[in-house]
């Protein structure tokens, strides 16, 4: 049982303690890789690991909780403790983390009166229910109960969103009444407006900063703010950014190793820090978030490599060794070790075994829901993925008109299973003309949710609700009578997929492609997506995430823990690209 205190310094069992931490997010790594990654943190000479706990993953449907496999944070905490490390836990409702909706569960959007991240009774009620499930699991791991947790965070960068101190106090009180006894803290940018709005310094809750450069300037700001309130607390950077996230259609963001190393060295001399991130990870499934720039949403890529010291696939980089070197220069007494490096394997190419046209099989793989007018996916219990809307109309005119209103994010339109158009961003709402020589016309509208904004003023914007919100007009009238198909790409849906048809000569609709790969000597590998268009890929029923030929990445990472001797890969392609093979490489591929 350890006693962790925050005075003019951090103290652990009465002795001064420097927090040397790295962020390793359990939910973005396969559990098989937790141990090696924690070892590599320890090999730097670091003593602490930091992680968020994403509400959206642990309560995917209201009142339905999960903490198995990749989400088994208790197993992760036990491993941290076994390896002699300490923990900083951020169990906040909102995490940002470049995570869809900032880690908030999408089902919150079903409530019209919901107000996010303020002292709103409905929001607090939902947080309270989650905390009732979460904190009994966390409490035994507190350091004063014999566990590794030193501190827990209240909210996250709140000073960049609002200034509702009553809300902040409600969250802190929820934590305390459920038994949190370790110190609480906040983390914000170090400009005065953020610190005044986002902290509870007046309630003696510890204040930390988030930044990745100019350590002296940022810690001076922190110190001045603390002194204004008569505090002589230690200086701590909770997110010392060593890289950055990347977005579709843009270049990978990089940071030079020496530039980082010198800033890390300066920060270590000034105070404690958490390197964000120590290791990147993967936005498996559809958890990647989205940036917002004025009216334009900019979705983030599947890789959460972050240009971190350890790559998405577990290889220490030049940055890692540079950070290890400067850590030794500042603290030569710390024990350091050679890190573990994971090796990937190329398995070659595998031929196509079968296909399925989504428009033919939608009713077989998911429930058909008939409603008068199109509803966003959240209203039918769907959080992520694609949603298909279908209506059958009488052919009345020589030329028909079609448009979808208030629809997010990317739309594909089909007439009698023939591709009519694809619309994205400002194109949505444009009118399309079509004609057919059949008595009845089948209209299909496939909408892709490309990720919700995770940071800033658009967190609660109407565009966070995905699918068709404003309606679909045919010949200037809102069409009544639409079948809804929620395409979640979960194990249940994929298990129902019959994907054995021969490929068509010409692809005209969204298509599933099935491959099998028999592997010996199983290792990590990479799917080469450079010849594909846009879609997502699953292996053995596990959704690896999105690919897009827009780049900057043209690969999907496959951890060895997802593979076995005989493997089934399903590629879902929306861009009418005919896929004939699946290639597994020993390296990632980037857009040239």
List the predicted regions and their residue ranges.
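Short strand-edge motifs at loop-to-beta-strand transitions and within beta-strands
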Residues: 391, 428-432, 513-515, 552-556
């Amino acid at each position: 049982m350890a006693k962790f205190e925050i005075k003019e310094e951090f103290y652990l069992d009465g002795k001064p303690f420097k927090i040397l931490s790295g962020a390793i997010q359990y939910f973005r790594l396969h559990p098989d890789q937790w141990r090696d990654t924690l070892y590599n943190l320890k090999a730097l000479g670091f003593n602490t690991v930091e992680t968020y706990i994403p509400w959206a993953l642990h309560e995917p449907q209201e009142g339905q909780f999960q903490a198995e496999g990749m989400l088994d944070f208790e197993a992760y905490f036990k491993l941290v403790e076994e390896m002699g490390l300490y923990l900083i836990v951020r169990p906040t409702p909102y995490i940002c983390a470049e995570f869809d909706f900032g880690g908030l569960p999408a089902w919150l959007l079903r409530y019209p009166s919901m107000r996010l991240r303020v002292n709103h009774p409905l929001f607090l009620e939902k947080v309270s229910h989650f905390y009732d499930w979460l904190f009994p699991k966390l409490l035994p791991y507190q350091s004063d109960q014999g566990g590794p947790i030193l501190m827990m965070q209240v909210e996250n960068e709140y000073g960049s969103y609002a200034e509702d101190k009553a809300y902040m106090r409600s969250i802190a009180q929820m934590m305390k009444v459920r038994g949190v006894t370790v110190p609480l803290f906040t983390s914000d940018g170090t400009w005065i407006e953020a610190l005044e709005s986002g902290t509870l310094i007046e309630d003696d809750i510890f204040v930390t900063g988030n930044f990745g450069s100019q350590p002296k300037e940022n810690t001076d700001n922190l110190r001045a703010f603390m002194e204004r309130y008569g505090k002589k607390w230690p200086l701590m950077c909770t997110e010392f950014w060593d890289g950055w996230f990347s977005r579709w259609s843009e270049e990978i963001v990089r940071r030079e190793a020496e530039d980082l190393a010198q800033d890390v060295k300066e920060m270590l001399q000034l105070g404690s820090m958490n390197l964000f991130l120590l290791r990147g990870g993967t936005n498996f499934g559809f958890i990647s978030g989205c940036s917002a720039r004025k009216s334009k949403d900019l979705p983030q890529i599947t890789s959460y490599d972050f240009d971190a010291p350890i790559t998405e696939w577990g290889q220490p980089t030049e940055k890692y060794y540079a950070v290890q070197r400067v850590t030794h220069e500042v603290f030569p007494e710390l024990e350091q070790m050679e890190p573990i490096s994971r090796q990937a394997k190329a398995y070659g190419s595998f031929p196509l075994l079968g296909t399925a046209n989504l428009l033919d099989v939608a009713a077989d793989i998911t429930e058909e829901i008939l409603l008068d007018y199109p509803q966003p996916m959240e209203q039918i219990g769907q959080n992520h993925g694609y949603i298909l809307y279908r209506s059958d109309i009488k052919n009345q005119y020589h030329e028909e008109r079609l448009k979808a209103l208030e629809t997010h994010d990317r739309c594909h339109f089909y007439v009698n299973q023939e591709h009519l158009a694809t619309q994205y961003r400002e194109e949505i709402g444009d009118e399309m003309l079509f004609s057919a020589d059949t008595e009845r016309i089948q209209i299909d509208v496939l909408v892709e949710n490309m990720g919700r904004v995770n940071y800033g003023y658009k967190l609660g914007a109407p565009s966070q609700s995905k699918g068709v919100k404003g309606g679909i007009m045919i010949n200037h009238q809102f069409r009544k009578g639409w079948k809804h198909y929620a395409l979640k790409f979960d194990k249940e849906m994929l298990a129902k997929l019959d994907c054995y048809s021969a490929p068509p000569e010409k692809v005209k609709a969204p298509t599933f492609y099935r491959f099998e790969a028999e592997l010996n000597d199983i290792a990590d590998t990479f799917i080469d997506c450079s010849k594909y268009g846009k879609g997502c890929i699953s292996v053995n029923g596990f959704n690896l995430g999105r690919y897009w030929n827009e780049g900057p990445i043209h690969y999907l990472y496959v951890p060895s823990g997802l593979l076995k001797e005989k493997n089934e890969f399903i590629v879902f392609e929306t861009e009418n690209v005919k896929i004939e093979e699946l290639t597994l490489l020993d390296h990632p591929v980037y857009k040239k």
